[in-house]
């Protein structure tokens, strides 16, 4: 019995003689439809098409192989039914010749068959990516050397503007960025020259009609609509009475003002700018709370009005930070620099092309561009037309079928146009894909190509037709309903680039059947009532502020967290997995197995954890889930170069190339190959402290130090030197791959690592290094030195490689993967983790932004004045790129949701759940109908923000609305079911380590294995050893070095414990100690869109340290000082923007600030940010120490004193604080820092040799001084 196709699928399979776009949603069976269409074309009808007359373009090689295999299987099955069919026999014979291929492979075939047309050596090869990167670096170095030799002024200005302070690396990166970007288009040089000319502008009038101006207008109208919506909502609330009528005096004119701005914008950017500069929001009329019926209505009205005011002010102060005249002058000023830069990019491109021709190599960009060169000609007027080769392809291919069309880029689109009849008679292009799953912008995928056809093609018979497949055959109804709810609420033309409405919604196509005795595994037939399937979509939120007395998010940010939120979230996931695998109520969670045709108990391999990015997350998840006894595998793509076996071999290669490298020689000697000990290293170093280890080893072997070292050590040194000399000789003539395998064999290291834990994996890693060496041997580089450079470049360009993959598809483990890698796959249970992670907008902060349609967005840089600011064009491009980034994030979220077949669990973390829920409710309340308006969706900083906003409108969102005090109209028609749980930190502090230890003790104490008195004696001895307690255990808990902050925190924890419990003995104190997990250093963390309170505090301290005390009287002076720090690159632009100059001025106007300035102006020195190290008695840290034993023991204390200054009668100490402080809680605040300030006083007393007369805290939050 054949497959039962839906009506829409039948149309997609059978429709001919047109350009056909098939919009196939997730799980709609598009691959099956595509295969069936091909099968019918080559086997049915009066004149079946030979399969080699079809061009089938897939996105990956794996997809091409699968397609070929499925077509082959279908033909073979048909032949079984009709063995005599000549048509089927012919198609099977032609299958290997069929063009079922990726675009790159097709281009390669075109080039190989037509190399003579482009003067290409037929012996060319595809260059290794790292080899090509090395060639690029060499070319850049030569190019810059030549440019410096020319002493070109424009080039020097370009270096000054973009080169960086210490090297040209930044400008190198910009050139490579331009090159890689333009090569994704069909006409790179023409595009670049055209976009540079956009800077050659002479008047304001020329702005109108520019594409980027139109985009800027679209962005502005979005902001104006948002402001208008908020003001009208504020007006509606105020008009309801209740004492809010005075607000209408402001709000009604402001509504008119926004309407006038919208009209002005429609008349042109100049008119709008003039109106915007005249726009103002007056002081809101005061309303006494006592006269208001509903205080919440008052706050909501004020909030809506304030938000709309901020939108207008942002347009005026940030987007139009310069006048239109200055904007035009700025672009004109940048024209010579952009022309110089484009010239460098073109020169680099030409040199790189020539070098590749010289070496007879091509890269992947060449494949598409050279193919296009073969496929096009130009007429006498320079117009592009198909070449003879292209015309032959148009005749040859009966149809061109493009899979995953949403991921095509512009050059690929051009190639398809050249080999097909898309734009002429008898159109023949079949395109299938789903624009909602276009997630490869970083590969220059252009979803607009799909969208343009999606909008313009018709759903009925026409030369350009579209068919929509939205029946999902993958997921349960519970998943379908959840997906539809979230994306109907969030996805729009603005964010997602497509309106997700009823037409776009998924329709249920999968049939799972009821859970009953007939379709369940035999062993569970008697437990039908005790079996579970599917269930609600679950949202689990980690509240990082949970169980802490934080009344403001700033306070949370200022103090370092005790637990890393990634680890805590992993624990939530661990608990959820264990709930599925072994429910506490004794039930069993079941999934449907298609192969069995029935329900079975869930296995670990049914579960996948999806993350936006696995870096920094997957390793932590693996470690944490392991403590829950969960088998888990993560293909992180990293960690390869950090494995001990690879580090050892690379160390050997380094010293074979150059033994004068102590780090590498110590690594090699310490390895099992030579087994030197630390004591032996010390002995060698003591022989000579100035020479390299290699030189010392040679002298040892030569007998110079015979009286100073043992015979064993001399023997080891000789053994090492003999092997090293042998290897250096062989490395000089052996190919590097053969030499590496020789090393494995000669050292027996390959066999040795196989005996280590995880030995199979380690040997696989060594084989990968061998394969890498083999690839290197096929490049134009030779020798060990260049191979080491090759590996170093590989590390730098790729960051790292993943370890060798030895895991089979059927291994029973939970898999962790990125959402991108999950595309095209499906899993019974999907756990979407890390949804609280902020969107990565780092690319938007770069000096130069590039956009295929809008061109080049750069800062205006005044080299002489040393200032830079965004051009108006950059504002427009930045806004467009941000919309595209967020649209892609929306589509990535859609891909994640639609991987789930039966169960979806979502986890994420927020700093403060109450604040997050409030923000989600605000976004929802200010959005009309059942959708979140696009302006509010754009404010979301993470997937969790989006999901949270959507659920505020859902009937199951009570918990979120209650926490966020939301008064929101609900979408009561939705059928999806959601459950919500917030997790406090305290619920997750307990790890499974205690359980593991207890299990080990239970096993140990079970004496079933004791068979003799000898065994008993050994048990007692082992217990005695394990039970040994060190006599001076207290001193082990006392650090030798401690910072003031750590000491302060330790005392605060102790005080908290004493307040909570009257008496805490040692045992309970141990049980209640907070679990500490090391966090990554700040520089290793991904940069967030907004600065934390702690970071803002650090910036404030930095400004207070470096600000010129002669320039702190006026706001403008302080602003100028901050700007100087930004220009000198002491602060980044973003850091400069968060400096609160008003708060700083308030300090210097305070009594304490005036005393500091008075001291400074009288010639006395003001000390700022003074680091110190001193000694304190260890009893201050650990009060349990016996003074008789530890009385003389000292601990080093280190810290930094913010400021102190001299007055006539003594010194004044000052410490700045940026913490949040409640009014009236100053005393608690002082107590919190009293230990710290007293330690500072004692230290200064020692340093200065006289008493510090006064000590103060200055609270920037309260804007006042607090005397200690």
UniProtKB/Swiss-Prot annotation:
Keyword list (alphabetical) reads: ATP-binding, DNA damage, DNA repair, DNA-binding, Exonuclease, Helicase, Hydrolase, Isomerase, Nuclease, Nucleotide-binding
Show the GO cellular component annotation of the record. cytosol; DNA helicase complex
Q: Which cofactor does it need?
A: Mg(2+)
Task: List the Pfam families hit by this protein, alphabetically.
Answer: PDDEXK_1, UvrD-helicase, UvrD_C
- Which Gene Ontology MF annotations are present? 3'-5' DNA helicase activity; 3'-5' exonuclease activity; ATP binding; ATP hydrolysis activity; double-stranded DNA binding
Q: Which InterPro entries match?
A: AddA, DNA_helicase_UvrD-like_C, DNA_helicase_UvrD/REP, P-loop_NTPase, PDDEXK-like_dom_sf, PDDEXK_AddAB-type, Restrct_endonuc-II-like, UvrD-like_ATP-bd
Domain UvrD-like helicase ATP-binding, first and last residues per copy: 3-476
Q: Which GO terms describe its biological process?
A: double-strand break repair via homologous recombination
The entry marks the following residues as binding ATP, namely 24-31
Per the record, what are the reactions this protein catalyses? Couples ATP hydrolysis with the unwinding of duplex DNA by translocating in the 3'-5' direction; ATP + H2O = ADP + phosphate + H(+)
Question: Its domain of life?
Answer: Bacteria
User: Record's Gene3D superfamilies?
Assistant: 1.10.274.50, 3.90.320.10, P-loop containing nucleotide triphosphate hydrolases
Which PROSITE patterns is this protein grouped with? UVRD_HELICASE_ATP_BIND, UVRD_HELICASE_CTER
Give the EC number: 3.1.-.-, 5.6.2.4
UvrD-like helicase C-terminal domain location is 528-824
PANTHER family, alphabetically? ATP-DEPENDENT HELICASE_NUCLEASE SUBUNIT A (PTHR11070:SF48), UVRD / RECB / PCRA DNA HELICASE FAMILY MEMBER (PTHR11070)
Of which family is this protein a member? Belongs to the helicase family. AddA subfamily.
Task: Cite the record's note on assembly.
Answer: Heterodimer of AddA and AddB/RexB.
Its biological function?
The heterodimer acts as both an ATP-dependent DNA helicase and an ATP-dependent, dual-direction single-stranded exonuclease. Recognizes the chi site generating a DNA molecule suitable for the initiation of homologous recombination. The AddA nuclease domain is required for chi fragment generation; this subunit has the helicase and 3' -> 5' nuclease activities.
Write the protein's name: ATP-dependent helicase/nuclease subunit A
User: Which organism is the protein's source?
Assistant: Clostridium perfringens (strain 13 / Type A)
């Amino acid at each position: 019995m054949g497959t039962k196709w839906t009506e829409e699928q039948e149309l997609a399979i059978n429709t001919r003689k047109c350009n056909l776009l098939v919009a196939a949603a997730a799980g709609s069976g598009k691959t099956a439809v595509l295969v069936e269409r091909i099968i019918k074309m080559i086997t049915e009808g009066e004149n079946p098409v030979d399969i080699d007359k079809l061009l089938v373009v897939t996105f990956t090689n794996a997809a091409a192989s699968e397609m070929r295999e499925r077509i082959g299987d279908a033909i073979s099955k048909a032949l079984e039914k009709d063995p005599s069919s000549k048509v089927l026999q012919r198609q099977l014979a032609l299958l290997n010749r069929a063009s079922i291929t990726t675009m790159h492979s097709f281009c390669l075939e075109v080039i190989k068959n037509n190399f003579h047309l482009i003067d290409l050596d037929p012996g060319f090869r595809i260059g290794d990516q790292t080899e090509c990167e090395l060639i690029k670096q060499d070319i850049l170095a030569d190019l810059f050397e030549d440019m410096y030799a020319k002493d070109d002024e424009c080039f020097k200005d370009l270096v000054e503007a973009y080169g960086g302070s210490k090297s040209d690396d930044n400008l190198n990166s910009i050139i490579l960025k331009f090159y890689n970007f333009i090569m994704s288009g069909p006409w790179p040089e023409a595009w670049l020259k055209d976009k540079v000319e956009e800077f050659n502008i002479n008047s304001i009038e020329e702005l109108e009609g520019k594409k980027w101006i139109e985009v800027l207008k679209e962005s502005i109208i979005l902001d104006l609509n948002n402001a208008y919506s908020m003001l009208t909502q504020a007006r509606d609330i105020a008009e309801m009475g209740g004492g809010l009528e005075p607000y209408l005096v402001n709000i009604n004119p402001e509504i008119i003002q926004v309407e006038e701005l919208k009209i002005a914008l429609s008349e042109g950017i100049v008119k709008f700018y003039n109106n915007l500069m005249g726009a103002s929001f007056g002081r809101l009329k005061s309303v006494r709370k006592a006269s208001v019926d509903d205080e919440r209505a008052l706050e909501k009205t004020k909030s809506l009005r304030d938000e709309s005011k901020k939108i207008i002010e942002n347009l005026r102060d940030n987007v139009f930070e310069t006048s239109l005249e200055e904007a035009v002058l700025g672009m004109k000023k940048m024209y010579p620099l952009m022309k110089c830069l484009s010239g460098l990019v073109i020169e680099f491109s030409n040199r790189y092309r020539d070098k590749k021709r010289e070496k007879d190599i091509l890269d992947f960009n060449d494949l598409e561009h050279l193919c296009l060169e073969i496929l096009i000609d130009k007429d006498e007027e320079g117009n592009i037309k198909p070449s003879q080769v292209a015309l032959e392809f148009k005749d040859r291919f009966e149809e061109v079928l493009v899979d995953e069309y949403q991921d095509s880029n512009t050059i690929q689109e051009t190639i398809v146009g050249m080999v097909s009849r898309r734009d002429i008679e008898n159109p023949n292009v079949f395109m299938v894909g789903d624009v909602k799953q276009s997630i490869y912008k970083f590969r220059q995928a252009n979803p607009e190509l799909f969208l343009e056809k999606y909008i313009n093609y018709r759903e009925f018979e026409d030369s350009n037709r579209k068919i929509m497949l939205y029946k999902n055959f993958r997921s349960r109804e519970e998943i379908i309903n959840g997906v539809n709810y979230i994306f109907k609420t969030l996805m729009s033309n603005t964010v997602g680039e497509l309106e997700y409405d009823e037409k776009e919604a998924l329709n249920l196509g999968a049939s799972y059947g009821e859970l009953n005795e007939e379709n369940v595994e035999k062993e569970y037939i008697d437990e039908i009532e005790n079996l579970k399937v599917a269930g609600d979509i679950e949202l689990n939120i980690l509240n990082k502020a949970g169980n802490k007395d934080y009344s403001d998010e700033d306070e949370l940010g200022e103090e370092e967290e005790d637990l890393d939120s990634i680890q805590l979230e992993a624990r939530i996931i661990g608990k959820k997995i264990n709930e599925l695998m072994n429910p506490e109520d004794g039930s069993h969670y079941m999934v449907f197995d298609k192969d069995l045709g029935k329900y079975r108990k869930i296995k670990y391999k049914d579960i996948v954890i999806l993350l936006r990015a696995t870096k920094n997350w997957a390793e932590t998840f693996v470690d944490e889930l392991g403590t829950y006894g969960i088998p888990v595998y993560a293909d992180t793509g990293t960690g390869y170069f950090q494995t001990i076996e690879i580090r050892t071999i690379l160390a050997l290669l380094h010293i074979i190339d150059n033994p004068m490298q102590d780090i590498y020689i110590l690594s090699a000697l310490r390895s099992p190959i030579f087994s030197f000990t630390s004591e032996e290293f010390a002995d060698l170093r003591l022989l000579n402290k100035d020479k390299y280890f290699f030189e010392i080893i040679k002298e040892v072997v030569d007998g110079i130090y015979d009286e100073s070292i043992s015979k064993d050590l001399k023997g080891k040194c000789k053994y090492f030197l003999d092997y090293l000399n042998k290897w250096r000789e062989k490395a000089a003539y052996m190919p590097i791959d053969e030499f590496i395998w020789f090393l494995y064999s000669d050292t027996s290291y390959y066999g040795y690592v196989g005996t280590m834990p995880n030995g199979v994996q380690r040997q696989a890693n060594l084989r990968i290094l061998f394969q890498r060496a083999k690839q290197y041997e096929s490049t134009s580089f030779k020798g060990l030195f260049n191979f080491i450079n090759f590996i170093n470049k590989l590390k730098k360009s790729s960051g790292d490689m993943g370890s060798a993959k030895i895991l089979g598809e059927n291994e029973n483990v939970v898999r962790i993967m990125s959402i991108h890698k999950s595309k095209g796959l499906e899993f019974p249970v999907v756990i979407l983790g890390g949804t609280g992670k902020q969107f990565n907008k780092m690319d938007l902060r770069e000096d130069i932004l590039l956009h295929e349609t809008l061109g080049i967005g750069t800062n205006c840089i005044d080299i002489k004045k040393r200032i830079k600011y965004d051009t108006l064009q950059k504002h427009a491009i930045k806004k467009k790129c941000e919309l595209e980034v967020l649209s892609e994030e929306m589509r990535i979220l859609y891909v994640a949701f639609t991987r789930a077949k039966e169960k979806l669990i979502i986890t994420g973390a927020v700093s403060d759940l109450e604040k997050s829920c409030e923000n989600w409710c605000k976004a929802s309340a200010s959005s009309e109908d059942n959708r979140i308006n696009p302006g509010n969706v754009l404010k979301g900083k993470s997937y969790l923000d989006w999901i949270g906003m959507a659920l505020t409108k859902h009937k199951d969102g009570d918990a979120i609305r209650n926490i966020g005090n939301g008064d929101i109209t609900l979408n009561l028609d939705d059928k999806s079911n959601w459950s919500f749980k917030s997790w406090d930190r305290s619920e997750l502090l307990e790890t499974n380590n205690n359980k593991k230890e207890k299990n080990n003790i239970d096993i140990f104490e079970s004496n079933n294995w004791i068979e003799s008195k000898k065994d008993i004696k050994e048990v007692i001895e082992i217990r005695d050893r394990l039970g040994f307690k060190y006599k001076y255990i207290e001193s082990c808990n006392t650090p030798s070095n401690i910072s003031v902050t750590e000491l302060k925190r330790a005392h605060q924890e102790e005080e908290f414990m004493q307040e909570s419990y009257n008496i805490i003995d040692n045992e309970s104190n141990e049980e209640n100690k907070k679990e500490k997990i090391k966090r990554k250093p700040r520089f290793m963390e991904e940069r967030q869109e907004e600065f934390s309170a702690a970071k803002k505090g650090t910036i404030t301290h930095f400004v207070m340290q470096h600000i010129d005390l002669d320039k702190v009287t006026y706001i403008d002076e302080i602003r100028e000082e901050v700007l100087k720090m930004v220009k000198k690159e002491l602060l980044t632009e973003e850091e400069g923007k968060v400096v609160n100059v008003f708060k700083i001025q308030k300090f210097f106007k305070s009594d304490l600030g005036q005393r500091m300035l008075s001291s400074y102006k009288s010639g006395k020195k003001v000390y700022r940010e003074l680091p110190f190290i001193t000694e304190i008695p260890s009893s201050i840290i650990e009060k349990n120490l016996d003074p008789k034993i530890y009385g003389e023991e000292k601990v080093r204390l280190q810290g930094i004193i913010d400021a102190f200054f001299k007055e006539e009668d003594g010194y004044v100490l000052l410490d700045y604080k940026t913490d949040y402080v409640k009014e009236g809680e100053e005393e608690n605040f002082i107590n919190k820092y009293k230990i710290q300030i007293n330690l500072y006083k004692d230290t200064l007393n020692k340093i200065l040799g006289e008493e510090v007369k006064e000590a103060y805290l200055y609270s920037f939050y309260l804007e006042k001084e607090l005397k200690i």
